[in-house]
Design a protein with these regions (language model features):
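Conserved N-terminal entry element of GNAT/NAT acetyltransferase domains
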Residues: 1-22, 26-27
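Conserved GNAT-fold acetyl-CoA-binding loop/helix
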Residues: 25-45
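A short helix-loop-beta-strand connector motif used in the catalytic cores of GNAT acetyltransferases and
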Residues: 45-59, 75-82, 108
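Conserved acyl-donor/pantetheine-binding loop and adjacent beta-alpha core of acyl/acetyltransferases
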Residues: 71-111
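Conserved GNAT acetyl-CoA-binding A-motif
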Residues: 105-109, 135-147
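Conserved acetyl-CoA-binding loop-helix of GNAT-fold acetyltransferases
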Residues: 114, 120-133, 159
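Conserved active-site alpha-helix within GNAT-family acetyltransferase domains
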Residues: 125, 148-166
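C-terminal "cap" of GNAT-fold acetyltransferases
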Residues: 169-183
């Protein structure tokens, strides 16, 4: 049975790392990249542990097996997460509803990933709805960025209600900054 929960064990962090590595852009064939989507950032166990100390991430399990994750990334994680710090720097002045994002109380989605055998089964929505349940009382917005080449992820985020607010290019990719408004 599928159920969403917060990360609570070291084993779950290890399972997140394993799923992350299996779905990295550089680990997939061009066909898989196009059809299945991908993740761009590599997460070490140490980095996951530090992020978890700030705020637990959300996972979906099928009985005891972790089949999806959505990493909670508070802005403070930018102090030890280089890629996240770059993202935060790039989006601080992005405007949302006439105000800079920096004027909102928001946190970031560090990454979302679902085991390929479980895609299309509602896990994406389950992960994000659990984020909303846990964090919407403390935050106005959930912000993330998605590779413009990751069409599957862009469609899934739009379907849930995320709105693209800004597009930029860095040394890695072209990124769409998307916002889920909980106000």
């Amino acid at each position: 049975m599928l159920h969403a929960t917060i990360v609570s064990t070291q084993t779950e962090l290890e399972q997140i790392q394993k799923l992350n590595h299996q779905n990295l852009k550089q680990s997939l064939s061009p066909e898989e990249l196009s059809k299945e989507g991908f993740v761009s950032w590599v997460y070490s166990l140490e980095l996951l542990e530090k992020m978890h100390q700030l705020a637990p991430s959300i996972i979906v399990k099928d009985n005891k097996e972790l089949v999806g994750y959505a990493l909670t990334a508070l802005k403070a994680a930018g102090n030890f997460h280089h890629d996240l710090q770059s993202m935060i720097s790039n989006i601080q002045l992005v405007e949302y509803q006439g105000k800079p994002l920096a004027n909102y109380n928001f946190y970031l989605m560090g990454q979302i990933c679902i085991h390929k055998d479980y895609r299309g089964k509602g896990i994406f929505d389950l992960l994000y709805q659990h984020h909303k349940l846990i964090y919407s009382g403390d935050y106005e917005l959930l912000v993330t960025e998605i590779s413009a080449n990751n069409k599957r992820s862009l469609r899934a985020h739009e379907k849930l209600g995320f709105k693209t607010t800004y597009t930029y290019t860095d040394n890695m990719d072209e990124w769409k900054v998307v916002v889920w408004d909980w106000i």
